């Protein structure tokens, strides 16, 4: 399932939405907001999720308008001149996907959507 792979693989953009014992699938979206005829650094981040992916019962969408950057989401990379640089993330995979995962973790037991993973 392509939507599940976005959440539960290292290559996926929504790993923060993965909740143990739940089959969550989804799609992230990050849009730059326009300002004065060009794009600003402000973003609108969305994560649309469905669960459980093996038998979809629920859809949950999180949309964040201008999410704050967090020091917890800091990507370090080696600069071409040899030193280390970093970027604070505030894209959907780091913000709205995490919110969705936390909410689904809390409401999942109420909705009785736990599943047993079969390999």
Model-flagged regions — what are they?
Residues 1-112:
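Active-site beta-strand/loop architecture of penicillin-binding DD-peptidases
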Residues 114-119:
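Short, highly charged C-terminal tails/helix-capping segments
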